[in-house]
Amino acid sequence: MEPEWTIISLLKWTESYFNSHGIDSPRMTAEILLAHTLKTTRINLYIQHDKPLSCSELIQFKTLIQRRINREPVAYITGSKEFWSLDFTVTRDVLIPRPDTECIVEATLALLPNQHSDQPKKILDLGTGSGAIIIALASERPHNVYFATDRSSAAAILARKNAAKHGLSDTIHFLCSNWFDAINPNKHSFDIIVSNPPYIPTDIIPTLAPEINRYEPRIALDGDHDGLSDIRKILHSAPDYLLNGGYLLLEIGFDQMNSVFKIAGNSSFYNCIEFIKDYAGHHRVLKLKKN
């Protein structure tokens, strides 16, 4: 007779199994996947720790374990990722939102009035992916006008769904567009433009963790030979879409500050070049003000 698997015994076994296979945060990963399987919360796993799993639940959980052993990111397995204390649906069509990217949200919110204004600001998010940045901004300052673009139609559709999930469908305008292509500068000028563009050098991508180089969309990672191709494009084009005195905020690689400073410094359109550090102390966000 096979032993009965309870929640707590399964958590202990899975933690050990993940640990032996070099999976990061083995206990937390086991909790997240088991809670997802049972459609409950991680806290409830411990409240119901002696509850046995059914055969179908065990089969489903074992499938999720194997996916994680194959180094598929937890966010893709569960289809969900928290960002800015909001829950986002994620698929392999979009980059998984990272905590470091919350720095660009913080820096942008500092530029936006907290109270309702008779003259709402216009904000544009380039390469929106799951919509994490623009939705986080709109959730905090819903009285402004928001636009977001992505070259991937699948990403744009997913971002719209995430906006609807958070009641922001009427607040954010999503466009399928390669950077600025679908935006007419004669009709739209923005107070703030934000972006988390691809900035990883092409030859570095194969050296990244399997969770990244096997599963996340290459189009959202690959910044060409030096990682700066899309950053250059945005820096070059943004002045045509920014109001005078408007701001451009870009996420950059942790080691790209000097290179990005040279590119930005060669433009006559910007002043007040500033770099903002992430939670690990790396210069993560470039902040520019248009003359």
Positions of the model-derived regions?
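Non-catalytic accessory regions of SAM-dependent methyltransferases
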Residues: 1-38, 43-46, 50
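Conserved hydrophobic residues forming the short capping helix/wall of the S-adenosyl-L-methionine
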Residues: 18, 112, 163, 238, ...
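Residue-level signal for inorganic ion chemistry
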Residues: 33, 71, 101, 133, ...
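Conserved AdoMet
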Residues: 34-111
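Conserved SAM/SAH cofactor-binding pocket of Class I
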Residues: 103-207
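Helix-to-beta-strand junctions that scaffold the AdoMet/dcAdoMet cofactor pocket
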Residues: 168, 216, 242-244
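Mobile active-site "lid"/loop adjacent to the S-adenosyl-L-methionine
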Residues: 199-230
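Conserved Class I SAM-dependent methyltransferase catalytic core
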Residues: 225-288
